[in-house]
Protein backbone atom coordinates (compact mmCIF):
# COMPACT_ATOMS: atom_id res chain seq x y z
CA UNK A 1 0.00 0.00 0.00
CA UNK A 2 2.75 2.58 0.80
CA UNK A 3 4.40 1.82 -2.56
CA UNK A 4 1.10 2.45 -4.33
CA UNK A 5 0.65 5.80 -2.54
CA UNK A 6 4.20 6.83 -3.39
CA UNK A 7 3.68 5.94 -7.06
CA UNK A 8 0.46 7.97 -7.13
CA UNK A 9 2.27 10.94 -5.60
CA UNK A 10 4.97 10.79 -8.24
CA UNK A 11 2.36 10.70 -10.99
CA UNK A 12 0.69 13.77 -9.51
CA UNK A 13 4.10 15.41 -9.18
CA UNK A 14 4.90 14.83 -12.86
CA UNK A 15 1.55 16.24 -13.96
CA UNK A 16 1.88 19.26 -11.64
CA UNK A 17 5.34 20.10 -12.99
CA UNK A 18 3.91 19.97 -16.52
CA UNK A 19 1.15 22.34 -15.43
CA UNK A 20 3.74 24.91 -14.34
CA UNK A 21 4.66 25.34 -18.00
CA UNK A 22 1.08 25.75 -19.21
CA UNK A 23 0.07 28.98 -20.94
CA UNK A 24 -3.00 29.29 -18.71
CA UNK A 25 -2.41 31.05 -15.38
CA UNK A 26 -5.17 29.10 -13.55
CA UNK A 27 -3.60 25.82 -14.71
CA UNK A 28 -0.17 26.93 -13.50
CA UNK A 29 -1.66 27.95 -10.16
CA UNK A 30 -3.33 24.55 -9.89
CA UNK A 31 0.06 22.94 -10.40
CA UNK A 32 1.48 25.04 -7.59
CA UNK A 33 -1.17 23.96 -5.10
CA UNK A 34 -0.75 20.31 -6.09
CA UNK A 35 2.98 20.53 -5.41
CA UNK A 36 2.38 22.23 -2.06
CA UNK A 37 -0.04 19.47 -1.06
CA UNK A 38 2.45 16.82 -2.09
CA UNK A 39 5.12 18.27 0.20
CA UNK A 40 2.68 18.16 3.10
CA UNK A 41 1.75 14.58 2.26
CA UNK A 42 5.38 13.46 2.15
CA UNK A 43 6.02 15.03 5.55
CA UNK A 44 3.04 13.17 7.01
CA UNK A 45 4.12 9.82 5.58
CA UNK A 46 4.95 7.64 8.58
CA UNK A 47 6.08 4.59 6.62
CA UNK A 48 9.45 6.09 5.67
CA UNK A 49 12.25 7.71 7.68
CA UNK A 50 12.13 11.45 8.34
CA UNK A 51 15.28 12.11 6.29
CA UNK A 52 13.67 10.38 3.31
CA UNK A 53 10.52 12.46 3.73
CA UNK A 54 12.66 15.59 3.74
CA UNK A 55 14.50 14.42 0.63
CA UNK A 56 11.22 13.83 -1.24
CA UNK A 57 9.89 17.21 -0.16
CA UNK A 58 13.15 18.97 -1.04
CA UNK A 59 12.77 17.92 -4.67
CA UNK A 60 9.44 19.75 -4.81
CA UNK A 61 10.75 22.76 -2.86
CA UNK A 62 13.51 23.06 -5.46
CA UNK A 63 10.87 23.17 -8.22
CA UNK A 64 8.89 25.89 -6.43
CA UNK A 65 12.04 27.96 -5.84
CA UNK A 66 13.06 27.50 -9.47
CA UNK A 67 9.68 28.88 -10.55
CA UNK A 68 10.26 31.99 -8.40
CA UNK A 69 13.72 32.38 -9.95
CA UNK A 70 12.55 31.88 -13.53
CA UNK A 71 12.57 34.97 -15.78
CA UNK A 72 9.32 36.63 -16.79
CA UNK A 73 9.50 38.83 -19.89
CA UNK A 74 6.99 41.46 -18.79
CA UNK A 75 9.07 42.45 -15.75
CA UNK A 76 10.98 44.75 -18.11
CA UNK A 77 7.74 46.79 -18.39
CA UNK A 78 7.19 46.93 -14.62
CA UNK A 79 6.96 50.72 -14.36
CA UNK A 80 4.22 50.93 -16.99
CA UNK A 81 2.27 47.79 -16.14
CA UNK A 82 1.87 48.85 -12.52
CA UNK A 83 -0.01 51.95 -13.71
CA UNK A 84 -3.79 52.05 -14.17
CA UNK A 85 -3.56 53.11 -17.81
CA UNK A 86 -0.92 53.55 -20.53
CA UNK A 87 1.47 56.46 -20.06
CA UNK A 88 1.54 59.23 -22.64
CA UNK A 89 5.12 58.61 -23.78
CA UNK A 90 5.61 54.98 -22.76
CA UNK A 91 5.96 51.74 -24.65
CA UNK A 92 2.17 51.29 -24.83
CA UNK A 93 1.45 54.69 -26.33
CA UNK A 94 -1.40 54.20 -28.84
CA UNK A 95 -1.49 50.48 -27.92
CA UNK A 96 -4.15 50.53 -25.23
CA UNK A 97 -5.60 47.07 -25.91
CA UNK A 98 -2.15 45.46 -25.75
CA UNK A 99 -1.48 47.32 -22.49
CA UNK A 100 -4.51 45.83 -20.74
CA UNK A 101 -3.75 42.33 -22.06
CA UNK A 102 -0.18 42.52 -20.79
CA UNK A 103 -1.28 44.08 -17.52
CA UNK A 104 -3.66 41.17 -16.87
CA UNK A 105 -0.92 38.65 -17.67
CA UNK A 106 1.52 40.54 -15.46
CA UNK A 107 -0.90 40.49 -12.53
CA UNK A 108 -1.72 36.80 -13.01
CA UNK A 109 1.94 35.84 -12.93
CA UNK A 110 2.58 38.01 -9.87
CA UNK A 111 -0.34 36.31 -8.12
CA UNK A 112 1.07 32.85 -8.86
CA UNK A 113 4.48 33.73 -7.46
CA UNK A 114 2.93 35.44 -4.46
CA UNK A 115 0.92 32.29 -3.82
CA UNK A 116 4.09 30.21 -3.76
CA UNK A 117 5.75 32.57 -1.29
CA UNK A 118 2.65 32.71 0.91
CA UNK A 119 2.39 28.92 1.10
CA UNK A 120 6.08 28.63 1.97
CA UNK A 121 5.86 31.50 4.45
CA UNK A 122 2.91 29.99 6.29
CA UNK A 123 4.82 26.75 6.77
CA UNK A 124 8.00 28.46 7.98
CA UNK A 125 6.19 29.75 11.06
CA UNK A 126 5.94 27.65 14.21
CA UNK A 127 3.17 27.84 16.82
CA UNK A 128 5.31 30.10 19.02
CA UNK A 129 7.81 32.86 18.39
CA UNK A 130 11.18 31.66 17.06
CA UNK A 131 10.02 28.07 16.63
CA UNK A 132 10.22 25.99 13.43
CA UNK A 133 7.33 25.42 11.09
CA UNK A 134 6.50 22.32 9.06
CA UNK A 135 8.79 23.38 6.19
CA UNK A 136 11.69 24.80 8.21
CA UNK A 137 13.96 21.79 7.57
CA UNK A 138 14.19 22.47 3.83
CA UNK A 139 16.86 24.48 2.03
CA UNK A 140 15.68 27.43 -0.05
CA UNK A 141 17.44 28.92 -3.05
CA UNK A 142 15.87 32.12 -4.37
CA UNK A 143 19.16 33.50 -5.74
CA UNK A 144 18.90 35.72 -8.80
CA UNK A 145 15.16 36.24 -8.45
CA UNK A 146 13.28 39.33 -9.58
CA UNK A 147 10.54 39.95 -7.04
CA UNK A 148 8.14 42.22 -8.94
CA UNK A 149 5.59 41.93 -6.13
CA UNK A 150 5.75 42.55 -2.35
CA UNK A 151 7.72 40.03 -0.31
CA UNK A 152 6.55 39.17 3.21
CA UNK A 153 8.65 36.50 4.91
CA UNK A 154 8.43 37.90 8.42
CA UNK A 155 8.66 35.64 11.49
CA UNK A 156 10.09 32.78 9.46
CA UNK A 157 12.30 30.04 10.86
CA UNK A 158 14.98 28.46 8.68
CA UNK A 159 16.86 25.43 10.01
CA UNK A 160 18.95 25.03 6.83
CA UNK A 161 20.84 27.44 4.55
CA UNK A 162 18.83 29.98 2.58
CA UNK A 163 20.01 31.98 -0.42
CA UNK A 164 18.50 35.25 -1.67
CA UNK A 165 21.74 36.57 -3.22
CA UNK A 166 21.69 38.48 -6.49
CA UNK A 167 17.99 39.27 -6.23
CA UNK A 168 16.03 42.40 -7.11
CA UNK A 169 13.06 43.61 -5.08
CA UNK A 170 10.86 46.09 -6.91
CA UNK A 171 8.32 46.49 -4.12
CA UNK A 172 8.60 46.29 -0.34
CA UNK A 173 10.52 43.35 1.14
CA UNK A 174 10.17 42.36 4.79
CA UNK A 175 12.15 39.57 6.46
CA UNK A 176 11.85 40.91 10.02
CA UNK A 177 11.66 38.84 13.22
CA UNK A 178 13.02 35.74 11.52
CA UNK A 179 15.44 33.07 12.73
CA UNK A 180 18.23 31.64 10.59
CA UNK A 181 19.89 28.59 12.14
CA UNK A 182 22.40 28.25 9.29
CA UNK A 183 24.02 30.67 6.87
CA UNK A 184 21.90 33.14 4.91
CA UNK A 185 22.87 35.11 1.81
CA UNK A 186 21.31 38.42 0.77
CA UNK A 187 24.43 39.69 -1.05
CA UNK A 188 24.54 41.61 -4.35
CA UNK A 189 20.85 42.48 -4.16
CA UNK A 190 18.86 45.64 -4.86
CA UNK A 191 15.81 46.97 -3.04
CA UNK A 192 13.62 49.61 -4.67
CA UNK A 193 11.21 49.94 -1.73
CA UNK A 194 11.46 49.57 2.01
CA UNK A 195 13.61 46.64 3.18
CA UNK A 196 13.04 45.18 6.65
CA UNK A 197 15.31 42.77 8.54
CA UNK A 198 14.54 43.99 12.06
CA UNK A 199 14.51 41.81 15.16
CA UNK A 200 16.08 38.77 13.52
CA UNK A 201 18.42 36.08 14.85
CA UNK A 202 21.31 34.77 12.75
CA UNK A 203 23.04 31.65 14.11
CA UNK A 204 25.34 31.26 11.10
CA UNK A 205 26.94 33.76 8.75
CA UNK A 206 24.73 36.58 7.48
CA UNK A 207 25.98 37.99 4.19
CA UNK A 208 24.53 41.26 2.83
CA UNK A 209 27.60 42.41 0.83
CA UNK A 210 27.35 44.64 -2.21
CA UNK A 211 23.66 45.49 -1.94
CA UNK A 212 21.79 48.69 -2.78
CA UNK A 213 18.85 50.01 -0.76
CA UNK A 214 16.83 52.79 -2.37
CA UNK A 215 14.17 52.86 0.33
CA UNK A 216 14.65 52.72 4.08
CA UNK A 217 16.67 49.75 5.35
CA UNK A 218 15.95 48.36 8.82
CA UNK A 219 18.23 45.91 10.64
CA UNK A 220 17.49 47.05 14.21
CA UNK A 221 17.49 44.85 17.34
CA UNK A 222 19.03 41.84 15.61
CA UNK A 223 21.47 39.25 16.92
CA UNK A 224 24.32 37.86 14.82
CA UNK A 225 26.05 34.80 16.28
CA UNK A 226 28.12 34.25 13.15
CA UNK A 227 29.89 36.82 11.03
CA UNK A 228 27.79 39.73 9.73
CA UNK A 229 28.95 41.16 6.41
CA UNK A 230 27.53 44.37 4.91
CA UNK A 231 30.69 45.38 3.02
CA UNK A 232 30.38 47.47 -0.14
CA UNK A 233 26.71 48.38 0.22
CA UNK A 234 24.90 51.59 -0.73
CA UNK A 235 22.04 53.12 1.25
CA UNK A 236 20.11 55.87 -0.55
CA UNK A 237 17.66 56.41 2.31
CA UNK A 238 17.88 55.99 6.08
CA UNK A 239 19.59 52.87 7.44
CA UNK A 240 18.88 51.65 10.97
CA UNK A 241 21.04 49.05 12.75
CA UNK A 242 20.52 50.19 16.35
CA UNK A 243 20.25 47.87 19.31
CA UNK A 244 21.97 44.92 17.64
CA UNK A 245 24.47 42.38 18.98
CA UNK A 246 27.36 41.02 16.91
CA UNK A 247 29.12 38.05 18.51
CA UNK A 248 31.66 37.60 15.70
CA UNK A 249 33.14 39.94 13.10
CA UNK A 250 30.92 42.75 11.82
CA UNK A 251 31.95 44.29 8.49
CA UNK A 252 30.33 47.52 7.25
CA UNK A 253 33.43 48.78 5.42
CA UNK A 254 33.55 50.44 2.00
CA UNK A 255 29.88 51.39 2.13
CA UNK A 256 28.06 54.59 1.17
CA UNK A 257 25.27 56.17 3.21
CA UNK A 258 23.47 58.88 1.25
CA UNK A 259 21.15 59.70 4.16
CA UNK A 260 21.46 59.20 7.92
CA UNK A 261 22.54 55.96 9.55
CA UNK A 262 21.64 54.87 13.09
CA UNK A 263 23.86 52.28 14.80
CA UNK A 264 23.17 53.31 18.40
CA UNK A 265 23.22 50.96 21.34
CA UNK A 266 24.96 48.05 19.65
CA UNK A 267 27.48 45.54 21.00
CA UNK A 268 30.39 44.20 18.96
CA UNK A 269 32.14 41.20 20.49
CA UNK A 270 34.37 40.66 17.46
CA UNK A 271 36.15 43.20 15.28
CA UNK A 272 33.91 45.97 13.92
CA UNK A 273 34.97 47.45 10.59
CA UNK A 274 33.40 50.67 9.29
CA UNK A 275 36.51 51.78 7.37
CA UNK A 276 36.51 53.28 3.89
CA UNK A 277 32.90 54.44 4.10
CA UNK A 278 31.12 57.66 3.17
CA UNK A 279 28.40 59.29 5.28
CA UNK A 280 26.59 62.12 3.50
CA UNK A 281 24.38 63.00 6.48
CA UNK A 282 24.75 62.23 10.19
CA UNK A 283 26.14 58.97 11.53
CA UNK A 284 25.09 57.89 15.02
CA UNK A 285 27.19 55.27 16.85
CA UNK A 286 26.34 56.41 20.40
CA UNK A 287 25.91 54.06 23.32
CA UNK A 288 27.79 51.15 21.78
CA UNK A 289 30.34 48.68 23.13
CA UNK A 290 33.34 47.43 21.17
CA UNK A 291 35.01 44.40 22.78
CA UNK A 292 37.82 44.19 20.22
CA UNK A 293 39.03 46.41 17.37
CA UNK A 294 36.90 49.18 15.94
CA UNK A 295 37.88 50.60 12.55
CA UNK A 296 36.53 53.96 11.36
CA UNK A 297 39.59 54.78 9.24
CA UNK A 298 39.74 56.25 5.73
CA UNK A 299 36.13 57.40 5.85
CA UNK A 300 34.34 60.64 5.02
CA UNK A 301 31.56 61.95 7.24
CA UNK A 302 29.85 65.04 5.86
CA UNK A 303 27.49 65.57 8.81
CA UNK A 304 27.53 65.15 12.58
CA UNK A 305 29.21 62.00 13.91
CA UNK A 306 28.04 60.79 17.33
CA UNK A 307 30.36 58.39 19.18
CA UNK A 308 29.57 59.32 22.79
CA UNK A 309 28.47 57.09 25.68
CA UNK A 310 30.44 54.18 24.22
CA UNK A 311 33.09 51.77 25.47
CA UNK A 312 36.10 50.82 23.36
CA UNK A 313 37.91 47.84 24.91
CA UNK A 314 40.33 47.33 22.02
CA UNK A 315 41.96 49.60 19.46
CA UNK A 316 39.86 52.34 17.87
CA UNK A 317 41.23 53.64 14.58
CA UNK A 318 40.00 56.90 13.02
CA UNK A 319 43.15 57.61 10.97
CA UNK A 320 42.90 58.97 7.45
CA UNK A 321 39.27 60.00 7.83
CA UNK A 322 37.65 63.34 7.11
CA UNK A 323 34.99 64.72 9.46
CA UNK A 324 33.35 67.70 7.78
CA UNK A 325 30.85 68.12 10.62
CA UNK A 326 31.37 67.82 14.36
CA UNK A 327 32.84 64.65 15.89
CA UNK A 328 31.46 64.06 19.36
CA UNK A 329 32.81 61.68 22.01
CA UNK A 330 31.50 63.59 25.04
CA UNK A 331 27.82 64.48 24.88
CA UNK A 332 24.51 63.27 23.56
CA UNK A 333 22.60 64.94 20.76
CA UNK A 334 21.21 67.54 23.19
CA UNK A 335 24.51 68.39 24.86
CA UNK A 336 24.18 66.32 28.03
CA UNK A 337 27.51 64.81 29.17
CA UNK A 338 27.87 61.14 28.22
CA UNK A 339 31.60 60.66 27.60
CA UNK A 340 33.01 57.55 26.00
CA UNK A 341 35.76 55.40 27.51
CA UNK A 342 38.84 53.94 25.84
CA UNK A 343 39.87 51.03 28.05
CA UNK A 344 43.19 49.73 26.67
CA UNK A 345 44.38 52.31 24.13
CA UNK A 346 43.90 55.92 23.20
CA UNK A 347 42.04 56.31 19.90
CA UNK A 348 44.28 56.49 16.84
CA UNK A 349 43.94 59.55 14.61
CA UNK A 350 47.28 59.27 12.76
CA UNK A 351 48.29 56.01 11.08
CA UNK A 352 51.79 55.05 12.20
CA UNK A 353 52.85 53.41 8.95
CA UNK A 354 52.05 56.29 6.58
CA UNK A 355 51.37 59.22 8.95
CA UNK A 356 47.96 59.67 7.35
CA UNK A 357 46.13 62.01 9.72
CA UNK A 358 42.46 62.64 10.32
CA UNK A 359 41.12 65.96 9.03
CA UNK A 360 38.33 68.05 10.54
CA UNK A 361 36.04 70.64 9.00
CA UNK A 362 34.43 71.86 12.22
CA UNK A 363 35.72 73.49 15.40
CA UNK A 364 32.69 72.25 17.37
CA UNK A 365 34.11 68.81 18.09
CA UNK A 366 33.95 67.24 21.54
CA UNK A 367 36.87 65.05 22.57
CA UNK A 368 35.96 64.72 26.26
CA UNK A 369 36.22 61.09 27.39
CA UNK A 370 36.01 59.31 30.74
CA UNK A 371 38.96 59.84 33.11
CA UNK A 372 39.03 56.13 33.94
CA UNK A 373 40.21 55.35 30.40
CA UNK A 374 42.79 56.72 27.99
CA UNK A 375 42.46 60.41 27.04
CA UNK A 376 42.44 62.03 23.61
CA UNK A 377 45.60 64.13 23.49
CA UNK A 378 44.93 67.46 21.81
CA UNK A 379 47.22 69.95 20.12
CA UNK A 380 47.14 73.74 20.20
CA UNK A 381 44.48 73.74 17.48
CA UNK A 382 42.09 71.82 19.74
CA UNK A 383 42.35 68.70 17.58
CA UNK A 384 44.01 65.34 18.26
CA UNK A 385 47.79 65.54 17.93
CA UNK A 386 48.92 65.47 14.31
CA UNK A 387 45.49 66.37 12.93
CA UNK A 388 44.37 69.54 11.19
CA UNK A 389 41.50 71.37 9.58
Task: For every predicted segment, state its role.
Residues 1-11:
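Membrane-embedded hydrophobic alpha-helical segments
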